[in-house]
Amino acid sequence: MGTNVQVDSASAECTQTMSGALMLIESLKKEKVEMIFGYPGGAVLPIYDKLYNSGLVHILPRHEQGAIHAAEGYARVSGKPGVVIATSGPGATNLVTGLADAMIDSLPLVVFTGQVATSVIGSDAFQEADILGITMPVTKHSYQVRQPEDLPRIIKEAFHIATTGRPGPVLIDIPKDVATIEGEFSYDHEMNLPGYQPTTEPNYLQIRKLVEAVSSAKKPVILAGAGVLHGKASEELKNYAEQQQIPVAHTLLGLGGFPADHPLFLGMAGMHGTYTANMALHECDLLISIGARFDDRVTGNLKHFARNAKIAHIDIDPAEIGKIMKTQIPVVGDSKIVLQELIKQDGKQSDSSEWKKQLAEWKEEYPLWYVDNEEEGFKPQKLIEYIHQFTKGEAIVATDVGQHQMWSAQFYPFQKADKWVTSGGLGTMGFGLPAAIGAQLAEKDATVVAVVGDGGFQMTLQELDVIRELNLPVKVVILNNACLGMVRQWQEIFYEERYSESKFASQPDFVKLSEAYGIKGIRISSEAEAKEKLEEALTSREPVVIDVRVASEEKVFPMVAPGKGLHEMVGVKP
């Protein structure tokens, strides 16, 4: 078939014979894919040839890492799988960080990589890399296609695997000759995946055990993770917490799963969590974890974590239950379905009046804080508060990793699900800007703010060109402290102020750099300038880069030092 010949899904089923590349395009249409993030190259040219005039929207980043992080942002906000294409060799290996990020944060991606022709696989051919071997630890599943007829079945399976159970990335490696050879197309394959049957319905006996545990607990607390968001269970979590009057703490990735202004909300738990959330986890007698995996950044020293508590762990991934914490009440199932079942049980509320009194006292005595002294420079915490104020709390906030990420989590109270896009488990610098692009493409009318540091921003700043090309109204707010802030903080506290390679001796002019990309750039150095310029920038429908000079020696508090328990926080008060 020639380059410009169009074959829609109906005619494809009728004619049956087509190239592997066209099978890929038609399969994506069957899966109702609307958007692809990709970067062409030699091994995927047959695919890009069939993509031409296919009707599918393709986003061309300026680096493959930008493609996969944008796909992550798209998946996180839309709930749909992000689709990525990259060529063989370096194109494929440039995706590894994004795959690892999506794997640990449970984001559904379907990633297509080109490969050298089957006849030269294993010969160190030009741009050959064993991408299956390289990515096996960081993908939920992976395939290498050897016959074009297998492509529709494999793609159908890949979307199913990526989006069911615990979501994750699936990689499909396509040799160039497989993309050009013709074969019979059919998308009517029955799904047959022996050994892959995710459990969504909970065991009734375990539900009863949990109901009984709640009725007898004096100090219950819920730890809600990203599994609540992946399961679209925010409303059920709120209803269950209110029904049983159980306070709720969140992991970093779980923010937005429970309204931050709710009386039962304790805040974020963990290394930079609130005093109340951390002490609640330390002192509770029943801990109900929902869609959280007891990451070390949440638990602190395990010897001290929830030391007197019975642990109930609700998770769709049975491999997570008992992996870190000994669990007395394991519940395998989808968070939404499990919570619906718990609500139906309408168990007896525990007598936790003294517990609630204690939590209220902690909230009153130990709020999040910072010293608002502008002689030390414009405080980044105040900047985040202004962003919240000027966006009315309705923005989608995408961040990089570091101090600015923690301040965003602490001082931008999220009321709704799917407004918070960040790299949690892997902690990937350079994530924020491309993820914001993906989020904006998923929600075209939303206000999307990329909050980044001056370090991480420079890892993927070339994606500004995508923002300009598509005229996306992304707002990029750079917390510019002229250093790697979190690294500098650790060096100050734990390494006797030996600031080894954490301060930037020189930097580009970010305003001029933005203007070179055709994007408006503004600079803010004080609270007065923030009041004057920030609201207009954040409420416009044009892309803007905002370079904010913030206090360089500001630290993120509270903080749990490595090896310490959650109750051993430092910096809980000025």
From Swiss-Prot:
It holds the Pfam family TPP_enzyme_N. Keywords: Amino-acid biosynthesis, Branched-chain amino acid biosynthesis, FAD, Flavoprotein, Magnesium, Metal-binding, Thiamine pyrophosphate, Transferase. The keyword Flavoprotein applies. Thiamine diphosphate binds at residue 64. One of its GO terms (molecular function) is flavin adenine dinucleotide binding. Its EC number is 2.2.1.6. Its cofactor is Mg(2+); thiamine diphosphate. Binds 1 Mg(2+) ion per subunit. Binds 1 thiamine pyrophosphate per subunit. It catalyses: 2 pyruvate + H(+) = (2S)-2-acetolactate + CO2. One of its GO terms (cellular component) is acetolactate synthase complex. It comes from the Bacteria. One of its GO terms (biological process) is isoleucine biosynthetic process. Mg(2+) binds at residues 454, 481. FAD binds at residues 166, 272-293, 315-334. Pathway: Amino-acid biosynthesis; L-isoleucine biosynthesis; L-isoleucine from 2-oxobutanoate: step 1/4; Amino-acid biosynthesis; L-valine biosynthesis; L-valine from pyruvate: step 1/4. Residues 403-483 are annotated as: Thiamine pyrophosphate binding. Dimer of large and small chains. NCBIfam families: acolac_lg, PRK07710.1. Belongs to the TPP enzyme family. Contains 1 molecule of FAD per monomer. The role of this cofactor is not clear considering that the reaction does not involve redox chemistry. This is Acetolactate synthase large subunit. It comes from Bacillus subtilis (strain 168). The gene is ilvB.
